[in-house]
Design a protein with these regions (language model features):
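P-loop NTPase switch module centered on the Walker A-proximal segment
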Residues: 1-98, 102-104, 138, 142, ...
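Conserved nucleotide-binding/hydrolysis modules and their immediate coupling elements
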Residues: 204-307, 315-319, 481, 490-540, ...
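Residue-level signature of catalytic and energy-coupling elements of molecular machines
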Residues: 14, 20, 52, 71-73, ...
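Conserved structured catalytic cores and adjacent interaction surfaces
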Residues: 2-19, 78, 91, 101-113, ...
Length: 599
């Protein structure tokens, strides 16, 4: 089978790329007729399915009309920029998937820009044309304008397009004429995506991602640029810094369907997995044993944000989790560094605190959520933006942010963003909604989403991506309200919560276990207030009729992990355990906090 096509799929969160890949797999009969696989086959960890985002890239391979098509699913989110660049290195063309109603979004621009720079051929799929009020032609023009802006060359601007609805299982050259299957899409891939360029010469393969199997250890994945790899062959590894390490390939796998199949040899142009390589890293080149030649390594986006990870030392530590010591946390973070390229870790002067650097709150919260599900307990400090000194000037990361919201509430939102040093770049009306673009420091984005959703009754859609470092923009107002802090350990009693409701909003339900120093609510004023919600009603034998009204308690506010991280202040931690998220003061007792203040 000589023909191989390697394509990467680019799409904004929730424009349907994972659904599209599902349909391609069904069309190419990867599954037996009676097999029930569930939807979203590619998003294979629970976190991805719940959030509807792809975090790590996947490889799937199908055969269509004697052509082997390797489909590489890319993460759509700029926080996972490290993943994106590696993945595009394996592809020869990209399939750009856009929603017929929303058009190309900022995150799409980020990945597409990388693909255009690498000189890949784009093909466009306008999906969800069955939506009401959609405008496929305008979206097609918007994609053209976007590519032109990014600096695509003429041959890239001459891109083929198909329209369709992946969920309904059809694609067509004309969106007004639905077909019965997705063949037009596959035909477009076979016809327009170039086959891999294969040079003559010795073996060369850039390791672009890795997998881990407890049975065989780490597995290197990449596309073989030239030459032929055979099982048992001796090779050289050219490291990122130019060092050369000798190694040997024990087993070779190629991708087939969703899985891998063991083969004896792999020809140039195909994507393969090597088992048994010792000591490789992502970005190394697998080269010839005698005269190794390295390939250009991948530049990875630098981290822009840091958080402090520390052991859980609250009064409730060890109740939920299996792994609670600093050794466990350090081992887990070190393991994550191997495959999570945009992540960095630094040890601090304390043995149980680690600084972890990443691309944004989402990037780090996905790691924390994964650890939490694996049974770890830990505490996280407030996210801090990384400030760099460039030519003697202090600079901070700046992002491009797009907010899509109803026109009625746009004034409030614009005011909120400008207070946080955001500058509006453009504003356009789409029906009854407005799409506003801002340039805003990353510091300003932390905690903005919560306030925006409150101000717009949950209607605002916010996306942002990192652009560059710019000189510091000055002070940004922090959270206005103080915290309600528990002064006793015990159970929250409805009677006490009821009496304190006019003091602020609570984060705990009646009956929940709490401890001294836990942040159990938000004060309606600006300072912190210690309250006791463990007090019960004193029972005396004097009763007047009607005085014992039932406590009417407003439901507690429950945070998601990102919301909690964005909410806390400098002197607070988020306590993360497999079953609970709690906010707490770093210093638990009121006396300690007062003493610390006076210093």
């Amino acid at each position: 089978m000589a023909n191989i096509k390697n394509i990467a799929i680019i799409a904004h969160v929730d424009h349907g790329k994972t659904t599209l890949v599902d349909k391609i797999m069904y069309h190419c009969q990867l599954f037996r007729e009676n097999e029930n696989t569930g939807d979203l086959i590619l998003d294979n960890n629970d976190l991805e399915r719940e959030r509807g985002i792809t975090i790590t890239s996947k490889n799937v391979s199908v055969v269509y009309k004697d052509t082997k098509i390797n489909i590489i699913d890319t993460p759509g989110h700029a926080d996972f920029g490290g993943e994106v660049e590696r993945v595009l290195n394996m592809a020869d063309g990209v399939l750009l998937l856009v929603d017929a109603f929303e058009g190309p979004m900022p995150q799409t621009r980020f990945v597409l820009g990388k693909a255009i720079d690498l000189g890949l051929k784009p093909c466009v799929v306008v999906n969800k044309v069955d939506k009401e009020n959609c405008t496929p032609e305008e979206v097609h023009e918007a994609v053209f304008d976007l590519m032109f802006e990014i600096g695509a060359e003429e041959w890239q601007l001459d891109f083929p397009t198909v329209y369709g609805a992946a969920k309904q299982n059809w694609m067509s050259d004309d969106w007004k004429k639905p077909t019965t299957n997705i063949e037009p899409l596959l035909d477009m891939v076979v016809e327009h995506i170039p086959s891999p360029k294969i040079e003559e010469g010795t073996v060369q393969m850039l390791i672009t991602s890795l997998d881990f199997s407890s049975f065989t250890g780490r597995i290197a994945i990449g596309r073989l640029q030239r030459g032929t790899l055979k099982t048992g062959m001796n090779i050289s590894l050219v490291k990122r810094d130019g060092r050369i390490v000798k190694s040997k390939v024990k087993e070779l796998h190629v991708f087939e369907g969703l899985g891998r199949k063991k083969v004896e040899e792999v020809q140039a142009g195909d994507i393969c997995a090597l088992v048994g390589l010792e000591g490789f890293d992502i970005g190394d080149t697998v080269a010839d044993f005698e005269n190794p030649e390295g390939l250009k390594t991948i530049a990875i986006d630098e981290p822009t944000m840091s958080m402090l990870f520390t052991i859980n030392d609250s009064p409730f530590f060890g109740k939920d989790g299996k792994f609670v010591t600093s050794r466990h946390i350090k081992e887990r973070l070190t393991k994550e560094l191997e495959k999570n390229l945009a992540l960095r870790m630094a040890e601090t002067d304390s043995a149980d605190k680690f600084m972890v650097f990443g691309r944004g709150v989402l990037h780090l919260s996905v790691l924390i959520e994964t650890m939490r599900r694996e049974g770890y307990e830990l505490q996280i400090g407030q996210p801090q933006v990384i400030i760099k000194e460039i030519d003697g000037v202090k600079c901070e990361p700046v992002e491009e942010m797009t907010i899509d919201l109803p026109e009625v509430v746009s004034g409030k939102a614009i005011e909120m963003v400008s207070v946080r040093k955001g500058e509006m770049v453009s504003m356009e009306a789409k029906g009854e909604r407005m799409v506003c673009k801002f340039i805003i420091p990353s510091r300003g984005i932390i905690g903005l989403r919560n306030n925006l959703l409150t101000a717009t009754a949950g209607e605002a859609i916010m996306t942002h991506r990192f652009i560059e470092y710019q000189p510091l923009k000055g002070g940004i107002p922090e959270r206005q309200n103080g915290s309600l802090v528990s002064m006793e350990k015990g159970q929250a009693i409805p009677y006490s919560i009821d009496k304190l409701q006019d003091r602020g909003r609570f984060f705990v339900d009646p009956g929940e276990d709490i401890y001294e120093g836990q942040v159990i609510g938000e004060n309606s004023r600006g300072d912190d207030m210690a309250v006791n919600v463990t007090k019960t009603k004193k029972l005396s034998n004097v009763r007047s009729s009607g005085a014992d009204d039932k406590a009417r308690i407003i439901p507690a506010i429950k945070f998601s992990l990102e919301e909690a991280l964005e909410y806390i202040q400098k002197d607070e931690y988020v306590e993360v355990t497999p079953n609970h998220l709690r906010l707490r003061k770093i210093l638990l007792t009121e006396v300690e906090r007062k003493r610390n203040k006076s210093i």
